[in-house]
A protein has these predicted regions:
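Conserved, well-structured ligand/cofactor-binding cores
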Residues: 2-503
């Protein structure tokens, strides 16, 4: 084995796995190595690493976020499924012999199905080169796992080569975008499931609070009565809408440019390859993947990413608004609105005893802000593409996969740690309604606008209830007032006010 006394960004995390980090360096002489070469020369690669020289150079070049591709299991799975589909297509075309294809397929299955070797995907998620570093990291890992499966040493590329065999008839410019689209499809399902659970939780609370009358508010001022159930029902409905919008946007990712190779012309690929590779990818993923009608357009266009990112931003905005509402409605406990109580999940202050803060809605707000920022980044990356290729897909992928993960976790946390445990303060809601001047709005059809305005002004000035003044002035009888102030009459379209005659 070769050794090298120079420092490197390579860390032996365990005897059988070498990890790369951007923050730690050790002397490579401490680990056994193998010599690999590329067009720039030779380097020593840790013998235990399943990645090779191309990955090593990428790790050195891009110590950007400290977040490796392996942080996103959906992307790792998608990358190797693309390699497996390509291997199958090339075997059907007679370009890849059965033994090599079988070894590559077995390697891909270990990574995709058994979640092994994900720690070997070590290049930074944000990188130059339009994803070439990620693609080569994948090629090298698949090749070296395949080599070991057939009894050969890592680095024996004369037997199975990362480029000639694993990357056969591919370019980064079609393999990586296809994998990214597939990864986003995989990551979307957990998000929509989480949104569905949250919508159901709000619906459940809407039923529980259907008889709790409260004051609705516009511009933070008292408006007209509604039920707390109606307020929570609105949260449920708006979230359910976004499940359909997200799925519609994600469906665009089923159209891929696999077979386009470098710029969409399909150079170096068999004319039959694209359709066969997409067919095999559909079979492996159980997704109805299709080949883009125009591969040149599909290679350069980022429209699907921009649309999907916008839908995620839409969801984030809704979640942030809902979180704002939960924080406002629970403000107090004695000097705020205090119509609802959020579950107490941790102490709120290091100086104020007994204080409990709405930390779950607060973290959802912050996740929403991150997603909104990611959307702007995706927009700029998409706009920054030039001519036949967009070099910024790695950052598009990083932003979208991060948004999906963060939204999924935030929504799940909001459901389980907050919404499921929300309680209504029924007495507080009733007190606010009874003392609200806005009750007079429900009486306008009966009393008229001018009389109602006079009652409201007097109630405000004298700090008295609207109902007391109406009875005092003889504008309505107690029975008539009770009829008009029934929960049904005040919280949905009703003819009651038209049918009650003035005394």
């Amino acid at each position: 084995m070769n050794t090298n006394s120079n420092s490197s960004n390579i860390v032996a995390a365990s005897p059988d796995a070498v990890r790369v980090t951007s923050s730690q360096k050790i002397d490579i002489a401490r680990v056994a190595t193998r010599r690999e070469h590329d067009l720039l020369g030779e380097l020593d690669v840790p013998a235990d690493a399943y990645w090779g020289i191309h990955t090593l150079r990428a790790v050195t070049n891009f110590p950007i976020t400290g977040i490796p591709v392996g942080h996103f299991p959906e992307l790792v799975r998608a990358l190797v499924l693309v390699k497996q589909a390509a291997a199958r297509a090339n075997r059907r075309l007679g370009y890849l012999d059965a033994a090599k294809c079988d070894a590559i397929e077995r390697a891909c299955e270990l990574i995709a199905k058994e979640n092994r070797f994900h720690e070997q995907f070590v290049v930074d998620a944000v990188q130059g080169g339009a994803g070439t570093s990620t693609n080569m990291n994948t090629n090298e890992v698949v090749a070296n796992v395949a080599l070991e499966l057939i009894g050969h040493a890592k680095g024996d590329y004369a037997t199975i080569h990362p480029n000639d065999d694993v990357n056969m008839e591919q370019s980064t410019n079609d393999a990586y975008p296809t994998a990214l689209r597939l990864a986003l499809i995989f990551a979307t399902k957990p998000l929509t499931d989480a949104v569905g659970d949250l919508a159901f939780a709000f619906k459940t609370k809407a039923i529980e609070f259907s008889d709790v009358l409260k004051i609705g508010r516009t511009q933070l001022q008292d408006a007209v009565p509604m039920t707390l159930g109606q307020e929570f029902e609105a949260f449920s409905v708006t979230l359910k809408e976004d499940i359909a919008r997200i799925n519609e946007a994600a469906a665009l990712f089923r159209e891929v440019n696999l077979g386009a190779t470098a710029i969409g012309t399909g150079i170096n690929a068999d004319s039959r390859y694209a359709l066969l590779a997409v067919e095999e990818l559909s079979r492996l993923t159980h997704e109805p993947m299709v080949s883009a009608a125009n591969l040149i357009e599909a290679t350069s266009d980022m429209g699907a990413f921009v649309l999907f990112s916008g839908v995620l931003k839409r969801l984030a905005v809704k979640l942030s608004k809902i979180s704002n509402d939960l924080r406002l409605l629970s403000s107090g406990p004695r000097a705020g609105i205090a119509e609802i109580r959020l579950p107490a999940v941790q102490a709120g202050s290091s100086i104020m005893p007994g204080k409990v803060n709405p930390v779950i809605p607060e973290v959802v707000n912050q996740v929403a802000f991150l997603v909104i920022g990611h959307d702007l980044t995706v927009t700029m990356c998409a706009e920054g593409g030039q001519l036949q290729l967009n070099a910024f897909e790695p950052t598009i992928g990083y932003c979208l996969l991060s948004s999906l993960r963060q939204l999924t976790e935030a929504i799940t946390t909001l459901t389980t740690r907050c919404v499921n445990g929300i309680e209504a303060d029924r007495e507080r809601c009733q007190s606010l309604v009874e003392n609200s001047i806005t009750l007079v709005t429900a009486l306008v059809p009966t009393l008229g606008y001018e009389a109602s305005s006079r009652v409201a002004k007097r109630a405000l000035a004298e700090k008295r209830r609207v109902s007391d003044i109406i009875l005092e002035e003889g504008l309505l009888t107690a029975d008539q007032l009770d009829e008009l102030l029934k929960i049904e009459a005040m919280t949905r379209p009703s003819r009651a006010a038209r049918l009650v005659a003035k005394p």
